[in-house]
Amino acid sequence: MAKLNQVTLSKIGKNGDQTLTLTPRGVNPTNGVASLSEAGAVPALEKRVTVSVAQPSRNRKNFKVQIKLQNPTACTRDACDPSVTRSAFADVTLSFTSYSTDEERALIRTELAALLADPLIVDAIDNLNPAYWAALLVASSGGGDNPSDPDVPVVPDVKPPDGTGRYKCPFACYRLGSIYEVGKEGSPDIYERGDEVSVTFDYALEDFLGNTNWRNWDQRLSDYDIANRRRCRGNGYIDLDATAMQSDDFVLSGRYGVRKVKFPGAFGSIKYLLNIQGDAWLDLSEVTAYRSYGMVIGFWTDSKSPQLPTDFTQFNSANCPVQTVIIIPSL
C-alpha cells in the first residue's frame, strides 16, 4: 500500500461504455486507508468517485475495499455545490490468516470488480446528474455552450436480478380465511386460518449463498467458496427481521402485509402470517423457530437512497419487497 498507481476503470456501467480514471490521493497514516479518486478537469468534481483499500490491522490480515460515488446535483460551468449529492456506496471486508500474498491481493482486485458490478453502483454511473456531464464536457472541450442534458430518469428503476432456478418455500404457508374477530383500538383484526398452500420461488438456494452484505448474516457461510459463489455480492439483498414482524404494532404499521391469524381448534394459537406470494401467507413463527437458520429475504429497490439502511423500521414492501424465504443449510 506504500505505492499507489493510477487506475483506469473501463467497460463499466450497464452498456460497458463508461471509463473512469482514478488518481492516487495518498495513504491516511491514522487509519491506513489508501484512496484514489477521479481526476476531472473541474476541481469541485474530483471527489465524485473514490476507491479505498484499508488495512487497519498491523499484521495486514484485514482488508476493506470500498467504492463511493457522489453525484453533484447542482452544477455550473466551473463548479458544483458539494453539499447536494446523490450517492451510491458498496464495500466488502476480507480477512486472511497470514500476511497478504499475491493471490490474496488478486482476490481483492476481483472483489473490486465485483463491487463495480453492483446494480446500485452501475445505476449511479449510468444515471449521473445531467448538469454533471455538461460541466465535464464543457471543461474537457475548453469552453463553449453546455451540451443538451442526457436523457436521465429522475428515479431509476432498481430491480432484483433474475433467479437461476426454483426453490420451494421450506415453511408452512396458508390462505387467509374470514375475519374471526374484529380488531379494537390499538389491535388489528384477527383472521381465521385457511387451507395450506405450496409456494415455489423463481430462485435457487445458491443464488443467495456467499453474500456477506446481510444484516445478521450467518457467519458459517464464510466457509463457502466465495470465488465461485459471489453472484449476490453487494446486490441489495437483506435479511428481513421476521421477529420484529410478529407484533400488533407491526401489523398496524402496514409496512409489510402481515396479518394476525387464529389457527383451527378450540385452543388454536394466534400467530402472525406474512404475505409472500399471491394469496399465500407464511407462518413467521416457523421462520424464527429456526433461530437464524430461516430467513425472509428482501431486495432494496430505492435508488434515491442506495445505501442499505441499518434500521429495520425503514424497510417496507415498496422499497424492499420480499423475494424469497430460505433455510441456510448446515455446513
Swiss-Prot record:
<dbReference type="Pfam" id="PF16814">
    <property type="entry name" value="Read-through"/>
</dbReference>
<dbReference type="InterPro" id="IPR002703">
    <property type="entry name" value="Levivir_coat"/>
</dbReference>
<dbReference type="GO" id="GO:0005198">
    <property type="term" value="F:structural molecule activity"/>
</dbReference>
<comment type="function">
    <text>Minor capsid protein.</text>
</comment>
<keyword id="KW-0946">Virion</keyword>
<dbReference type="InterPro" id="IPR031819">
    <property type="entry name" value="Read-through_dom"/>
</dbReference>
<dbReference type="InterPro" id="IPR015954">
    <property type="entry name" value="Phage_RNA-type_capsid"/>
</dbReference>
<keyword id="KW-0167">Capsid protein</keyword>
<dbReference type="GO" id="GO:0019028">
    <property type="term" value="C:viral capsid"/>
</dbReference>
<dbReference type="Pfam" id="PF01819">
    <property type="entry name" value="Levi_coat"/>
</dbReference>
<protein>
    <recommendedName>
        <fullName>Minor capsid protein A1</fullName>
    </recommendedName>
</protein>
<keyword id="KW-1159">RNA suppression of termination</keyword>
